[in-house]
Amino acid sequence: MNESQNESWHREPRKIRIHDESCFEYMRKAGLLAAQTLDFITPYVLPGVTTEELDRLCHEYISDNGAVAAPLNYKGFPKSICTSINHVVCHGIPGERRLSNGDTLNIDVTVILEGWYGDTSRMFVVGDKVKRLAERLISVTYEAMWKGIKTVKPGESKGGAGPNQVHGSPCSLYFLCSESIV
């Protein structure tokens, strides 16, 4: 680790910025579009479909709704959404791999609408074959997400939600590293 990396590792966590009411409507619109994109793509998450096709459909949906897909060309990222299949923890790049019955797939959607970001993701089980371990991981991480959301308050540091959401929950069986659960 070089000196600048070492310094950034130890800096104080930034506080959550408190916005006024005029900003909330923009945040809601961007977040809603990101969520609607996941609702839109849900019926297409089927065995035999490629993640490239899911990316194309999401890109068109986001563009047709007046927004930009934030990941596209961000630090060279080549796609409009992130698709993480099975053991890929996060930020997988859509491609020609066909989804199989029983795959787990996380689709991460980030949009920019009127200058505001909306970012969300959803975990899918492809087809009707669910592996018990995958079902358990999905269940406990969903629980951890809601525990973390409940800890977020104005004036709190951004780094506090991660440890708080897993302590004492079934998620403590998994490892939390940065923004990923492995």
Summary of predicted features, one role per range:
Residues 1-182:
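Active-site neighborhoods and metal-handling regions in enzymes and metal-associated proteins
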